[in-house]
């Protein structure tokens, strides 16, 4: 039999009076691709340099069950998430460049989409049929000695 919170349509992490931070964290991590390593969160977009959007997302999910001290609850959840999402080994991938529309491999292949968590992602799109950067190549020719 389901508990009262589930029957009322409330989340499993809310008992009607308080928020179970561990259950909230568990549910949040199941629905969001996020890990914590080397002192930072990482998502399919790359390193999270500002936790404010993450905190805002947590707030959006918590506000249906508004209880006292929401900012402290959010801080506790973020700290708990650091433990729950901790990954010890997250090595760089030197054979690829993650771009806003996919991943470019050094062998020239391109895979569209953002299927996995990455260390960084450049905010530019890969365009395989883009025209040659004539002006840039002229600039480089002026800097470098001919081969």
Model-derived segments and spans:
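Generic cytosolic/nucleocytoplasmic N-terminal low-complexity/intrinsically disordered segments
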Residues: 1-3, 32, 37, 81
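P-loop NTPase catalytic core of nucleic-acid-dependent motor ATPases
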Residues: 29-53, 98, 103-147
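Alpha-helical structural motif
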Residues: 20-21, 54, 58, 73, ...
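Short, small/acidic-rich helices and loops at N termini and domain boundaries
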Residues: 1-7, 40-69
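Extended, Lys/Arg-enriched charged tracts that mediate electrostatic binding to polyanionic substrates
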Residues: 9-19, 23, 67-104
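Short, charged low-complexity intrinsically disordered segments located at boundaries
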Residues: 52-58, 88-94, 110
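Residue-level detector of intrinsically disordered/flexible regions characterized by low predicted structural confidence
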Residues: 4-6, 75, 129
């Amino acid at each position: 039999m389901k508990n009262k919170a589930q029957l009322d349509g409330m989340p499993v992490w809310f008992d009607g009076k308080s928020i179970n931070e561990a259950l909230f964290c568990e549910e949040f991590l199941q629905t969001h691709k996020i890990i914590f390593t080397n002192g930072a969160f990482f998502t399919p977009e790359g390193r999270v340099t500002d936790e404010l959007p993450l905190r805002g997302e947590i707030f959006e999910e918590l506000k249906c069950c508004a209880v006292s001290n929401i900012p402290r609850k959010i801080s506790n959840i973020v700290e708990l998430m650091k433990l729950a999402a901790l990954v010890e080994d997250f090595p760089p991938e030197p054979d690829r460049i993650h771009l806003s529309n996919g991943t470019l491999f050094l062998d020239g292949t391109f895979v569209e989409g953002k299927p996995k968590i990455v260390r960084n992602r450049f905010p530019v799109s890969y365009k395989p049929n883009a025209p040659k950067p004539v002006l840039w190549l002229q600039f480089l020719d002026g800097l470098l000695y001919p081969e």
